[in-house]
């Protein structure tokens, strides 16, 4: 009993220390993960993350003990079920997640195992003798005899995802040397600084977040303006619209304040605020006319000289 109590206390201390040292946790499923595979995963995460396994009852008991001081840990409790473990990290969550999921190994089908994905048998020659045709026929696999061997004529879905693999299906897959399953750690949930979320949230880019945020703000502002219900996104639009109405009323009435006087004057005397460009062009016109007159006089002078100058050569 003393040894068990010591082990329990040691596990509690280790879990508490990891919770305090690391801000993020991957809750991972380890169904069908071998000890060798677990060792390889620990090696790949060395320096970036720490893997901790433990009995669910002990983990839940420890977390409930820590909840009094840190209520956020209660969010971990619903996910401590089945064959799970914790991966603690302070690193980039997406990079650590990819390393966790990268370690996969192919595995043969076992009778009674739940298929994690659809299992297909491809069309082609099996190299098996015709005497085993009845075995294929019993499973509904379309075959024919070609060059003295059994040939599967079309691709066939043998087992659907989520279904149990039967003894006959497992035997056939092993006969064909097909290892249809891949096993490795899966990620049940991510805990980061008090929040829990699915791992696919890590694939959302900053651009997607900004676009969604902008769309939401626009929608809220539109609804608020339509319902005449002020909200933070709509207030600026409400103020602008209200100011436009005030300006319209002030222009049509004697209401006045310093800022509106210039606007009223512009409306009453538009010519006073006309651009200086037309005036400048008007001034330029006489100057151009004078230049043309001078040019014409010069040409006439040249013609006169050319007409009589030849007589004195």
Swiss-Prot record:
Residue numbers of Phosphoserine PTMs: 301
Gene3D superfamilies according to UniProt: 3.30.70.1730, 3.90.105.20
Ranges of Acidic residues composition bias in the record: 294-306
Entry annotated with the keyword Ribonucleoprotein: yes
Main subcellular location: cytoplasm
This protein's record includes keyword Transmembrane helix: no
Record-linked Pfam families: Ribosomal_60s (PF00428), Ribosomal_L10 (PF00466), RL10P_insert (PF17777)
Compartment(s): Cytoplasm
Compositional bias (Low complexity): 274-289
Recorded family membership: Belongs to the universal ribosomal protein uL10 family.
Protein name, entry field: Large ribosomal subunit protein uL10
Annotated source species: Neurospora crassa (strain ATCC 24698 / 74-OR23-1A / CBS 708.71 / DSM 1257 / FGSC 987)
């Amino acid at each position: 009993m003393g040894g068990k109590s010591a082990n329990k206390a040691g596990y509690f201390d280790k879990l508490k220390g990891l919770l305090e040292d690391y801000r993020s946790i991957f809750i991972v499923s380890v169904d069908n993960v071998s000890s060798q595979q677990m060792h390889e995963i620990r090696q790949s995460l060395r320096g970036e993350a720490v893997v901790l396994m433990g009995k669910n009852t002990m983990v839940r008991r420890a977390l409930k003990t820590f909840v009094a001081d840190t209520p956020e840990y209660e969010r971990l409790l619903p996910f401590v079920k089945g064959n799970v473990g914790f991966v603690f990290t302070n690193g980039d969550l997406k990079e650590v997640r990819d390393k966790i999921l990268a370690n996969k190994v192919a595995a043969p089908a076992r009778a009674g195992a739940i298929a994690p994905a659809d299992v297909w048998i491809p069309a082609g020659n099996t190299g098996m003798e015709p005497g085993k045709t009845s075995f294929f026929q019993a499973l509904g696999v379309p075959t024919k005899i070609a060059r003295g061997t059994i040939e599967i004529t079309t691709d066939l879905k043998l087992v659907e995802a989520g279904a149990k693999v039967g003894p006959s299906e497992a035997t056939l897959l092993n006969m064909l040397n097909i290892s249809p399953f891949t096993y490795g750690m899966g990620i049940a949930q991510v805990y980061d600084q008090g929040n829990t979320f699915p791992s696919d949230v890590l694939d959302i880019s900053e651009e997607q977040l900004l676009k969604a945020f902008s769309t939401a703000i626009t929608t809220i502002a539109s609804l608020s303006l339509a319902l005449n219900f002020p909200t933070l996104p709509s207030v600026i639009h409400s103020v602008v619209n209200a100011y436009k109405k005030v300006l319209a009323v002030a222009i049509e009435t004697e209401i006045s304040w310093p800022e509106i006087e210039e606007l009223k004057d512009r409306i009453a005397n538009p010519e006073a605020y006309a651009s200086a460009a037309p005036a400048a062009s008007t001034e330029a016109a006489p100057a151009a006319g004078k230049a043309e007159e001078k040019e014409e006089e010069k040409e006439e002078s040249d013609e006169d000289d050319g007409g009589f100058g030849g007589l004195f050569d």
